[in-house]
Regions:
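NAD(P)H-binding glycine-rich loop region in Rossmannoid oxidoreductase-like domains
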Residues: 1-17
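Active-site helix of classical SDR
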Residues: 56
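Strand-loop microenvironment adjacent to phosphate/nucleotide-handling motifs in alpha/beta enzyme folds
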Residues: 32, 62, 66-218
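SDR active-site strand-loop-helix element
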Residues: 38-43, 81-83
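Hydrophobic, well-structured modules enriched for small/aliphatic residues and gly/pro motifs
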Residues: 3, 9, 47-49, 90
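Catalytic tyrosine of NAD(P)H-dependent dehydrogenase/reductases that use a Tyr as the general acid/base
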Residues: 53
Length: 218
């Protein structure tokens, strides 16, 4: 996916082609080749998106979810896992701060800014759980902490000064893993949530709910 938020704001056509057209091509290819199960990786920015990247990932998520009804007799199952910031991944804030630490000055967009953080291992575990649990149409969301960017910066370079540079195009102060509109068909489990789609009444399907507790009933 095209995943850098400001880059997507300045290059919308490439972002749409990669994240939306690419998802459509992948759904078609998996169905054509008879793939049994597909788990797509998504992002917290797809929840109530305000930037182009988040909007394209929201569309991508919906394409994969709808692929379950589109697959027909092939019975290809599609599900989605929603990540926060994967610590250490390419383009994320921690590797950037590490590269800047020797300069003794870290650029901070806004002192109030927070981000959800998860480890690579947590991300991999969530994917494997999705493969084991999925019926088709689920969005799996890991329970992960939200951290202040200033706390992350201090953990990496305690002595470094912070230079306030302002929020970049398309960025939010605070992300959310699950939007208010999704809460009515979101179920809670020990270490994750599962958002079930409203289409085809799948949010009421006992096989998909699988002993989950409804987050919001009204």
């Amino acid at each position: 996916a095209t995943k850098i938020v400001p880059t997507a704001e300045y290059n919308p056509f490439e972002c749409v082609k990669t994240n939306i057209s690419g998802a459509m091509n992948l759904v078609d290819a998996c169905i054509d080749q008879g793939v049994k199960s597909v788990v797509a990786l998504s992002t917290d920015k797809a929840s109530s998106p305000v930037n182009l990247y988040g909007a394209t990932k929201l569309v991508s998520d919906k394409l994969f979810i709808a692929g379950n009804s589109y697959s027909g007799a092939q019975d290809t199952q599609f599900a989605v896992v929603r990540y926060g910031n994967v610590m250490g991944s390419r383009g994320s804030v921690i590797p950037f701060f590490v590269t800047q630490a020797d300069k003794n000055v870290l650029p901070i967009t806004d002192t109030r800014m927070t981000r959800f953080m998860m480890t690579v291992e947590e991300g991999v575990d969530l994917v494997w759980h999705a493969f084991e649990d999925m019926v088709g149409g689920e969005i799996y969301v890991k329970k992960i902490p939200s951290m202040k960017i200033t706390d992350v910066a201090r953990a990496i370079a305690p002595a470094a000064k912070h230079e306030i540079v302002g929020i970049l195009p398309g960025e939010k102060l605070h992300e959310q893993m699950i939007g208010l509109e999704d809460a009515a068909h979101t179920y809670e489990y020990e270490d994750h949530y599962k958002i079930l789609p409203a289409i085809f009444n799948w949010s009421q399907d006992p096989a998909r709910i699988n002993k989950g507790k409804l987050v919001q009933s009204d």
